[in-house]
Curated annotation (Swiss-Prot):
Lineage of source species: Bacteria, Pseudomonadati, Pseudomonadota, Alphaproteobacteria, Hyphomicrobiales
An MF annotation (GO) of this entry: ATP binding
Bilayer topology: Peripheral membrane protein
Reaction catalysed by this enzyme: phosphonate(out) + ATP + H2O = phosphonate(in) + ADP + phosphate + H(+)
Protein name as annotated: Phosphonates import ATP-binding protein PhnC 1
Organism expressing this protein natively: Rhodopseudomonas palustris (strain HaA2)
Length: 280
């Protein structure tokens, strides 16, 4: 379905963002990308849809070599890839429905897109998608009036309106609270399963990735250092991806060690309260 071989990206500054990255994704596969900041996760996703031009290597979507495309052929190939962004990338002044229909812009003529006149079949499909993501009651609401979770659901519906073969998902939960993050990830995985869609999900939350994504690819300094099941993310593997850390400590224990106030018995004598004053 998607095959990446020896992918490289080097910027004009000389920085090498990706180093010989190779991986294959089959139809219906959902793959999580994890790694520290600057590991190349977003760059990899953007190389696939050619928002970033690779320096070397091959990216094949089916029988199409994406790295060689330009102009009309590249636009046609991008129809096959739906993009879901961290910051939603909605047009704030447009309604929810208009934002979803923008996913069909690659399929209609210039004047139809200019006047936002879409075929009835596209409109009906947009209604169905909004119902599926739980936004039937928000169809005519402006995008800037929505909550973060609702905005991301619009972004998901817009990507699906393209009728893609592959979803490229860049930090879909970074701006969301924990509960909404779980709801969004659950929705994404359910929709991929229903439609047989492949997906690459760049995600910073390892626990969330382990909960929802069956296969994990770990990047460090632009290189693949792990490619396997989520259950294989042992402390040793996480250290290989992120560097040294006590992975046995829970977040609660970390919080206790950082935030817990000192006990009176541990204070220096100069800071201890006189017992007589304590009774006042």
């Amino acid at each position: 379905m998607l095959r990446i071989e020896n992918l490289d990206k080097r910027y004009k500054t000389g920085d090498r963002a990706l180093k010989d990255v190779s991986l294959s994704i089959g139809a219906g596969d959902i793959v999580g990308l994890i790694g520290p900041s600057g590991a190349g996760k977003s760059t990899l996703i953007r190389c696939v849809n050619r928002l970033v031009q690779p320096t070397g290597g091959s990216i094949r979507l089916g029988d199409t070599e994406l790295t060689r495309l330009g102009g009309t052929e590249l636009r046609k190939a991008r129809r096959r890839m739906g993009m879901i962004f961290q910051e939603f990338a909605l047009i704030e002044r447009l309604t929810v429905m208009e934002n979803v229909l923008s996913g069909r812009l690659g399929y209609v003529g210039f004047w139809a897109s200019w006047f936002r006149r879409f075929p009835q079949a596209d409109v009906q499909r947009a209604f169905a998608l909004l119902a599926r993501v739980g936004l039937s009651e928000q169809v005519d609401k402006r995008a800037d009036a929505l909550s973060g979770g609702q905005r991301q659901r619009v972004g998901i519906a817009r990507a699906l309106a393209q009728d893609p073969e592959l979803l490229l998902i860049d930090e879909p939960t970074a701006s969301l609270d924990p509960k909404t993050s779980r709801q969004v990830m659950r929705l994404i995985t359910e929709l991929c399963a229903e439609r047989g869609l492949a997906a690459i999900v760049n995600i910073h939350d390892v626990a969330l990735a382990q909960l929802f994504l069956p296969r994990i690819v770990g990047l460090r300094a632009g290189e693949v250092v792990y490619d396997g099941p989520a259950s294989g993310l042992t402390p040793d593997v996480l250290t290989r991806i992120y560097g040294e850390e006590d992975w046995s400590k829970t977040s609660d224990e970390d919080a206790d060690s950082v935030d817990a106030p000192p006990r009176a018995a541990d204070l220096p004598a100069s800071l201890k309260l006189d017992p007589a004053l304590a009774r006042l």
